[in-house]
Amino acid sequence: MQKVFLTGITGYIGQHCAAELLRQGYEVVGAIRSRSKADETRSAISRVASIKKLSFVEVDLLSDKGWKEAMEGSTYVLHVASPFLLKEPKDESELITPAVEGTKRVIAAAQFAGVKRLVLTSSTFAIIAGKETGRYGPTDWSDTDADIGAYAKSKTLAERAAWEAANGGNMEMTVINPGAVFGPSLGAELDGQSVTMMNKLITGKIPMIPDMAMGMVDVRDVAKLHVAAITASGAAGKRFIACTAEPVSMATVAQVLREAGYKKAPSMKAPTFLLKFMSKFDPEAKGMLPFIGRKASYENSATFDVLNWKPTPMATSFREMAASISK
């Protein structure tokens, strides 16, 4: 039985990754910051998978303590954990420092433990932020010198740090770059950017639709791609874009929700000038600004070819995510 060490197991994507690993017969060791999170995480994952081979270890991404011992005996590592804030922070280092330092810490521990392959969760925000409308692929990188916001900058710098740390060692590394992630949440807590956004859409807390369109993906597909990347031949040393080739607009998301009976989902579009004005005093509006009006498309053929991706229809993801949140 092969053991997989998983960071971010208490989060939206991490719980689905744990469930997929368990369904495929792996032993899973989940990294948690506090033992108080273990029971609710175990309960969430047990809804969709057997948890007989699930255990937890207490470690902190901001501390060196315990990491090398925690990974002992692990064949693979999934580094899914990453800090997020829907609102733009006053100090970008709140996001960037833990993302970069945590990633370096995980890779160093994995190399010390003799891990065969590490799969890192990055983002399309590490590919297209600061770029104009166009088509982008796995060789493209976000422009960290542009005003791209703290989240995109943290994902870009953390992934660059990961490649640098892994370069030249014996451990293989593969990166998954998801777009905006939708689909059912397993846990009771509304964490994760898209979960928070969906909750606001269906409860009327986003009264107007921003002019945003993004590559999107189902969370269960993201989990399957992470697990496939563990053993796929031809995956080592590569980045895989996990999202629709063409951007899906927030107007489309809202329309699917309204048609599914979520009457509070917005129907009016927010004028860009209004968002620019609001960004002066609203951190959420400020966080959206770098992506307003830009519509990137993606070269994602390698994800189909190497990882055998079979995408879930996004309308299904939107409806099932809303249903899981509104229970």
Where are the predicted features?
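A conserved pocket-lining segment of Rossmann-fold NAD(P)-dependent short-chain dehydrogenase/reductase
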Residues: E88, T144-D147, V181, A188, ...
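Active-site Tyr-X1-5-Lys
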Residues: A146-M173
